[in-house]
Structures are given as structure tokens and as C-alpha cells.
């Protein structure tokens, strides 16, 4: 950490976005409903593959985040007001895409009194109303550790609630803006204690050691996390 120089990617790592029929249709549905996805906001290198298969991770509560985590490419600043039609638009898009499993995430909304919790809950309820056979996985922010706000999401009853630890304890303060390692563990504990499947994710490639990753995994097990994803950090390019 601490080196801002962008590293040129090897040719074998580069992929073509592609533009098959499913990709074009997914793009049309997302844009026609004025929705955001973490795929495009985060400049995800897998967007072509996922959209080409008709899947996308919807990002609610706008596309401007109140935090500025160093690993993330999502825009930071003063967000716009919430769109009251967004929950319905997300649910309609999921129906049009015929998704059997929907994944939703959001920017952080530290500017709102409830940090976006009610909007989260309404989105989940609308998805379930319009898509009763679709399972719902939500990747939530920490809501500043406020249990009553996390409980609003829990009571909407998604099948999986995920909150990413992102990295190991030592590196967390350097890359996670306004987040806290132990607060995140308590968020996951609250999810697990509710009976909903608790999930988390981390990146490797930030300077962590194998022992530190094992320590993090032990911490997650201790609070009841059932699913962990581990990905390789790839720095977004400017274009």
C-alpha cells in the first residue's frame, strides 16, 4: 500500500467486453430503468462475461458514495436524493431478466438519517413481491454498526445477507474509508444470529500474509459467517 502508481496489466489478463445478444439486452434493461450496477460503476473486468450471460449486480441508492475506499472505483461525493421509484424499477428489471437469483448492493449513504436502511428494505420487499420465486442476496454497508438499521434489512427477509470485510485487520484502516474491522464483524454476527445466511468477501493482493488471511477466516467463523468469497484485487484503469 502507499504506492499510487498504476501497474500495466499483462496482455493475457485483458479480456474483451464483447457485445452478444444477452449483453445488449441486459444493458438495455438497466439503462431503460435508469438503474446503476456495481459492474459499470466499479469498472469490473468481468462485466462482459456476466452481462453476456444475462446477470448483473444492481447498485441501489444512487451511484455516488459518501465514502472513499482506496480500492474502489465508485464515485465519491455528495449523493443525490433517493429515487422513490428505484425499488420498483429494480424488481421490474429482475423480472424482465428472468433471474432466479438476484444480487443487490449499494453505495454508502452516510448523509441520510437512516443511512438508506428503509430504502434497502423497500427494495427487497418489492423484489419479493414481483419475483416470488427469485432468491435475493444483498451486499450491505455497515450502517455505522447501528443494529436497528441492520435489523430493517434483516426483517425484509432476503435469503443471503453479505457484508464484506474486504481485507485483513492490519490493512483495513488503510483502505476502508470510515469502516472498522470489528464493527464489520459485529454486523456479520447480527446477520448470523437472525438465522439468515451470513456471507462476506475479501480481496487478496493488498500486501496481506497467508497467516493474516487465516486469522480473518477464524474471526468470520467465530461470528457465524457461512460463506466467504476470496478474489484478486485488480486496480481499475481510467477507461
Show where each model-derived region lies.
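Catalytic cores of large soluble enzymes that bind and process phosphate-bearing ligands
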Residues: 14, 18, 82, 115
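N-terminal small/glycine-rich loop or linker at the start of catalytic domains
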Residues: 64-72, 193-199
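Conserved AdoMet/S-adenosylmethionine-binding subsite of the radical SAM
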Residues: 86-96, 100-102, 106-239
Amino acid at each position: 500500500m502507499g504506492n499510487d502508481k498504476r501497474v500495466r496489466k499483462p496482455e493475457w489478463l485483458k479480456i474483451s467486453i464483447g457485445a452478444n445478444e444477452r449483453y445488449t439486452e441486459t444493458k438495455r434493461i438497466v439503462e431503460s430503468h435508469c438503474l446503476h450496477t456495481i459492474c459499470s460503476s466499479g469498472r469490473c473486468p468481468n462485466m462482459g462475461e456476466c452481462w453476456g450471460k444475462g446477470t448483473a449486480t444492481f447498485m441501489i441508492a444512487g451511484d455516488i458514495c459518501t465514502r472513499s475506499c482506496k480500492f474502489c472505483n465508485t464515485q465519491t461525493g455528495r449523493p443525490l436524493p433517493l429515487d422513490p421509484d428505484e425499488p420498483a424499477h429494480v424488481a421490474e428489471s429482475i423480472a424482465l431478466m428472468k433471474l432466479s437469483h438476484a444480487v443487490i448492493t449499494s453505495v454508502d449513504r452516510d448523509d441520510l438519517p437512516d443511512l438508506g436502511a428503509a430504502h434497502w428494505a423497500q427494495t427487497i420487499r418489492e423484489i419479493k413481491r414481483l419475483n416470488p420465486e427469485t432468491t435475493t442476496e444483498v451486499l450491505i454497508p455497515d450502517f455505522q454498526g447501528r443494529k436497528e438499521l441492520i435489523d430493517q434489512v434483516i426483517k425484509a427477509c432476503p435469503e443471503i445477507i453479505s457484508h464484506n470485510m474486504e481485507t485483513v485487520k492490519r490493512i483495513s484502516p488503510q483502505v476502508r474509508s470510515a469502516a472498522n474491522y470489528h464493527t464489520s464483524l459485529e454486523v456479520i454476527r447480527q446477520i448470523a444470529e437472525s438465522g439468515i445466511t451470513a456471507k462476506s468477501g475479501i480481496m487478496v493482493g493488498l500486501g496481506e500474509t497467508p497467516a493474516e488471511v487465516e486469522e480473518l477466516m477464524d474471526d468470520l467463523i467465530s461470528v457465524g459467517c457461512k460463506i466467504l468469497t476470496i478474489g484478486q484485487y485488480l486496480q481499475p484503469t481510467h477507461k
